[in-house]
Amino acid sequence: MQLVSCGNIFWVFLRALTVLNEPVSLVTRLVALERIAGYRVDQQAREDLGLIPQFGGTVGAVRTTLIRALGGWDQTMLTEDTDLTFRCILAGHKVRYVNDAESYEEAVEGFRSYWHQRSRWAKGHMQCAFKYSLRLVRCKGLSFREKLDGLLLLNVYFVPLIVALAWIIGVALYFTNPQFWLQSFWSLIPLSFYSAAGNFAPFFEVGIGAYLDGRKRIYWLIPLLFITFFINIAICAKVFLELCISRIIGKRQFVWKKTLHNGYGNHYINYSPKQLPRET
């Protein structure tokens, strides 16, 4: 944690490497895949390119003087980690990511808990997008690359909405004039390339992260990420509608629903050797 001693760096966060209860269920295994992609690839790329690493809330070191200077934690924000990250950046301070320092966590074990947790993340992230997007664009202390990356990061939970809207429009257009689309079949080629490089980018991140970590057997789970992909589309649509209604009626305070944990966050689950997953 030597970075903390640097004068202009007020926040360092670590990699959430190991999901201690990964073998418990399908959900914990999929969460482990998301963690590999989000930290091993996504956050490391932001750090290497000098962009804006986003504190994920798992573990890190932040100066208390910074928190006091920024007015403390904002209790109206559901994702206080993202909120404080951008308050720190906009105030001219640095946030750094350390991939070599490993941390551990307990993942949610069922789809109900996954839904509640990701709903809070989506709502809090959208709150931050409404609150900081314009300020980020106007900030004079950030480069164009940092502003662009920050905007993409803030608005990442709107992407599932755009994907769902594109599906709806595509189906409607097809049934409105199917003959036109059959004649324009060649247009599917660039669209396919765009989908492969854009919509499916998270799946590529998982594959690259698993490769870098040497976890070959986990590749077989990547197709199952489509389950959480569709779940997150539904989550983001519901949350966006709730936020729009809240802004119309003037509601600013949201209920924080605690994530259910079973106490596996500080030790490995006591499985027999035959039950533990093996990597080759």
Residue positions per predicted region:
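Long helical/loop segments within the catalytic core of UDP-sugar-dependent glycosyltransferases
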Residues: 1-78, 119, 123-130
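Short, hydrophobic alpha-helical packing/hinge segments within bilobed ligand-binding/sensory domains
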Residues: 2, 84-85, 114
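Transmembrane helix-bundle signature of multi-pass membrane transporters/permeases
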Residues: 18, 77, 83, 87, ...
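Catalytic donor-sugar/metal-binding loop of nucleotide-sugar-dependent glycosyltransferases
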Residues: 85-104
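Nucleotide-sugar-dependent glycosyltransferase catalytic core
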Residues: 106-123, 253, 258
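Intracellular alpha-helical coupling/juxtamembrane segments of multi-pass membrane proteins
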Residues: 114-132, 230-240
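Juxtamembrane C-terminal module of membrane proteins
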Residues: 134-151, 169-280
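Transmembrane alpha-helical segments and their cytosolic interface motifs
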Residues: 151-166
